[in-house]
Amino acid sequence: MTVLAWCIAWLLDFVIGDPQNWPHPVRWIGNLISATQRVVRRYCHSDRSLRIGGAVMWLVVVGVTWAVSWGVLALASEIHPWFGWLVEIWMIFTVLAGRCLANAARDVERPLRAGDLAESREKLSWIVGRDTSQLQPEQVNRAVVETVAENTVDGIIAPLFFLFLGGAPLAMAYKAVNTLDSMVGYKHEKYRAIGMVSARLDDIANVIPARLSWLLLSIAAALCRYDGYRALHIGWRDRYNHSSPNCAWSEASVAGALGIRLGGPNDYFGERVEKPWIGDAQRGISVDDISRTIRLMWVASTLALALFIAVRCLLVGAA
């Protein structure tokens, strides 16, 4: 039943994603982070105290998320096993973000194909932290491909990995870790101290999923008839061409698979950030590379699901 729950949840994400106004735990986690952050900032003012407060905030948010998830699942199962199973499916469904990511990428792609650069810049600004107001079409394409490649890890592969390790409650706890990093894990002055622990622990949580993405995306590239060998080669060669210890694994794999170059300089919060290039520019990046990257994401996520199911069946059976 557990394996079936995984498959149904994955299919639900693939088919419908997160409907608008649907009750979503990530919103509740975000509200908890905001409330906890306000308390920390009220009592902590020095960098040292903010770092300690940030660590406490991380423990509270991740601990509460895991405990509530476990408690809700246990209570639902006590009411009726089938009800518990449905709640488990819902929890797993909410931690997967494949359809949401694909739709967000398509929202940028459509106006770009229609020649509406202003609209594509605006839609892009909803999913990236960089300044999009002056981006040219090639830069918009690059930003979308990078976003899909990077979020293939923390939106799909990592949640499935933690689901495999500890069931729906641990997958929910990972989502809290990832949301903390998204909200406070920045390097600029406002968040550097309070978000230090969140940023570093998110890096640690994604160590294995990021490296798995290199292998899975390389296999996906071969299955999609892109360049699987170059995905493997560039993914390894350029794996450290990023300030994050994890992001370049998936981005470099996609760059190699498609024969394009990612990375480079970008503007964040009014500051120019110089980043190393990832991949080799065998050709210029195009709007079609957005669709290709989405395809790679779906194939890699299918492979991840199959891998974790196979390992679980080998270890404990299909129950």
UniProtKB/Swiss-Prot annotation:
Keywords: Cell membrane, Cobalamin biosynthesis, Membrane, Transmembrane, Transmembrane helix
CC per GO annotation: plasma membrane
Top-level division of the source organism's lineage: Bacteria
A Pfam family this chain is assigned to: CobD_Cbib
UniProt keyword Membrane present: yes
Family statement: Belongs to the CobD/CbiB family.
Protein name (database record): Cobalamin biosynthesis protein CobD
Provenance organism: Citrobacter koseri (strain ATCC BAA-895 / CDC 4225-83 / SGSC4696)
Gene name of the record: cobD
